[in-house]
Amino acid sequence: MAEETPRYAVVTGANRGIGFEICRQLASEGIRVVLTSRDENRGLEAVETLKKELEISDQSLLFHQLDVADPASITSLAEFVKTQFGKLDILVNNAGIGGIITDAEALRAGAGKEGFKWDEIITETYELTEECIKINYYGPKRMCEAFIPLLKLSDSPRIVNVSSSMGQLKNVLNEWAKGILSDAENLTEERIDQVINQLLNDFKEGTVKEKNWAKFMSAYVVSKASLNGYTRVLAKKHPEFRVNAVCPGFVKTDMNFKTGVLSVEEGASSPVRLALLPHQETPSGCFFSRKQVSEF
């Protein structure tokens, strides 16, 4: 019997947490995975850990350094994948940041308790907002743009954008921004840029609170709402692809100081499912809350 054609995946932000676990689950299914991270030493350590644990070869799991905020770094990775594999089947955009400074002790003490006020334990600034948008929105967008030519060579191209239920439109309180992002028919990359630029402008002018962008974590909410919107735009532009955004649930990770309720194994299983579902059974242009299609 002829050996099955190998399938290739790239996972961003993968040296720990959900990204690391996505790599483990994909590699366990025989997918050849490129694990990427900003920190080279941590990334190489992560690859060695998985190779030992899964008893897989150097060909099955590779490392490449990647900073999604740096276009040159993305180009370098795309060249590497082209040279190594000649195509790509699965792109998982997992890298992300919170865009805030958190009082970790207050979070651990109060998370999940009644009357807990997020806005009292976090600090948001223009610089943090800019970085959050750059990594959470423009990072995945540039990754998609760089890898679309290689994904087109796959017989079942997948893009899985790891998002958050915080990016659902009900959490975008600014009516103008919500109006643009909820108008799926007319949504374009340019219109998403308009929303982002307005948020940055309001941060610069100190009017974010009065413009009522979100209850808290405005940068994170808008970055993920924008990523969800871009998922719809991309799915429409490439009907032969399967492009979806997914909230993995409230997972115990370093980002939330391990205050989540789900394990990383449970969290990673939702993006992995979307990466591996048979092509005909996979919808496109959807937002999933874990394994269920949910509203944007």
Swiss-Prot record:
Reaction(s) this enzyme catalyzes, per UniProt: (+)-neomenthol + NADP(+) = (1R,4S)-menthone + NADPH + H(+)
InterPro entries: CBR1-like, NAD(P)-bd_dom_sf, SDR_fam
Binding site for substrate: S164
Gene3D superfamilies: NAD(P)-binding Rossmann-like Domain
Residues annotated for NADP(+) binding in this entry: 16-40
Cited function: Aldehyde reductase that catalyzes the reduction of the aldehyde carbonyl groups on saturated and alpha,beta-unsaturated aldehydes with more than 5 carbons. Involved in basal resistance against pathogens.
UniProt-listed PANTHER family: (+)-NEOMENTHOL DEHYDROGENASE, (+)-NEOMENTHOL DEHYDROGENASE-RELATED
This protein's name: (+)-neomenthol dehydrogenase
Native organism: Arabidopsis thaliana
Taxonomic classification: Eukaryota, Viridiplantae, Streptophyta, Embryophyta, Tracheophyta
